[in-house]
From Swiss-Prot:
Name this protein carries in UniProt: Small ribosomal subunit protein uS7
Membrane listed as a keyword: no
SUBUNIT field: Part of the 30S ribosomal subunit. Contacts proteins S9 and S11.
UniProt xrefs under InterPro entries: Ribosomal_uS7, Ribosomal_uS7_bac/org-type, Ribosomal_uS7_CS, Ribosomal_uS7_dom, Ribosomal_uS7_dom_sf
Function: One of the primary rRNA binding proteins, it binds directly to 16S rRNA where it nucleates assembly of the head domain of the 30S subunit. Is located at the subunit interface close to the decoding center, probably blocks exit of the E-site tRNA.
Keyword Acetylation recorded: no
MF-aspect GO terms: rRNA binding; structural constituent of ribosome; tRNA binding
UniProt keyword terms in alphabetical order: Ribonucleoprotein, Ribosomal protein, RNA-binding, rRNA-binding, tRNA-binding
Family matches, as PROSITE patterns: RIBOSOMAL_S7 (PS00052)
Organism this protein belongs to: Aeromonas salmonicida (strain A449)
Similarity comment: Belongs to the universal ribosomal protein uS7 family.
Length: 156
């Protein structure tokens, strides 16, 4: 943490094709080894697959999928007198998006389709329908928070 001043959050440029900041952030999450053009090709390919498969607006499906994955609460470990408690805390909006995108990409990488674009499209469509591994991950996190609701007073 800086001692002098709070460092401002760097403004992310919107996506060149659709003009969406959220999609630009998602392209960055998909990116591996700094290969942004490859990442963009994967994401745009996935959106094209979504448009042909579902017949709906691909950006709307993307937004809906992220909405279904975003966690409201998560648990954080808090040590109190020799015991470690899993304390449920509310997730900040920026972290909600970051977690949703990370879970979505992780779930897509574990799928069985041939190309990454197909995996991503499949996971996005599943998430939009409230199915898939990424939605299950969100449910697991919410379940953990619900189970540890008794320790909510340890919040910091």
């Amino acid at each position: 943490m800086p001692r002098r001043r709070v460092v401002g959050q760097r403004k992310i440029l919107p996506d060149p094709k659709f003009g969406s900041e959220l999609l630009a952030k998602f392209v960055n999450v998909v990116m591996v080894d700094g290969k942004k053009s490859v990442s963009e090709a994967i994401v745009y390919g996935a959106l094209d697959i979504i448009a042909t498969k579902s017949g709906k607006d691909h950006l709307a499906v993307f937004e809906e999928a992220l909405d279904n994955i975003r966690p409201a609460v998560e648990v954080k470990s808090r040590r109190v007198g020799g015991a470690t408690y899993q304390v449920p805390v509310e997730v900040r909006p920026v972290r909600r998006n970051a977690l949703a995108m990370r879970w979505l990409v992780d779930a897509a990488r574990k799928r069985g389709e041939k190309s990454m674009a197909q995996r991503l499209a499949g996971e996005l469509l599943d998430a939009a329908d409230n199915k898939g591994s990424s939605v299950k991950k969100r449910e697991d996190v919410h379940r953990m928070a619900e189970a540890n609701k008794a320790f909510a007073h340890f919040r910091w």
